[in-house]
Amino acid sequence: MKTAIVTGGTSGIGLGVAKMLLGKGYYVYTTYVGADFTEKIENFEPIKVDQTNREELYRFIAHIKEKCSSIDCIVCNAGMTIRKSFTETTDYDWDCMMEVAVNSHYILVRELYSLIPAGSRIIFTGSQMGLMPHAMVLSYGVTKAAVHALAKNLVKEFEGTGTTVNAIVPGFVETPWQKEKPEEIKQNIYRKTAIHRFASVEEVVDAYRFCIENPFVNGSLIEVNGGYSYK
């Protein structure tokens, strides 16, 4: 049985990707924070890990090294948003967002490098906000731009192995977090999206499936945004 890791895999896009991998026969380890994940899913092992905390991250890595002889797929999906203006964002806010989206995933792939066999898949969750600016999420956009750069640069570390590294770049998606937006804000986003709605989780998960199934897609930022533009 192949083994996969999905960070932030108990809700939204992460859970959708995890279930897709389960359907492909993977055993899936996932990290999460917040309330305990109590749903029982076969071959799915959720582990509570605060990815802003290096000690917790390294404990998770040690657990993976103890349990697994190889890791065939890593989906670096976890991210963090703190909605504050540019001048209100503190050093701590900035550090936490960078730690979750960028630093923890750099460490995860680096520490598990020797367990990643030829022909594996590494996929990052980026964001449209990492390509174009957006009000009130400057720091989030910067973290996602760094995620995009990390994905593209990691390609060279796996050159000649058949292992591919890509990033999926979603626009606005019908996740629990997005559903909490005020209706006025959602309608404004709909107007800026050529298809006039948010993506479903399943539509975004299809892009991850494509990266897993196609061995020649490598170093790509794959946008799934419904034709979103800042008009």
Question: Language-model features: where?
Answer:
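Residue(s) in the substrate-gating loop at a strand-loop-helix junction
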Residues: 127
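Alpha-helical segment proximal to the catalytic Tyr-Lys
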Residues: 114, 156-160
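C-terminal substrate-recognition "lid" of short-chain dehydrogenase/reductases
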Residues: 197-224, 229
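Active-site helix of classical SDR
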Residues: 109, 143, 151
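Conserved NAD(P)H cofactor-binding loop of Rossmann-fold oxidoreductase domains
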Residues: 77-82, 227
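Conserved glycine-rich cofactor-binding loop
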Residues: 10-11
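Substrate-binding pocket helix/loop in short-chain dehydrogenase/reductase
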Residues: 85-86, 90-95, 178, 189
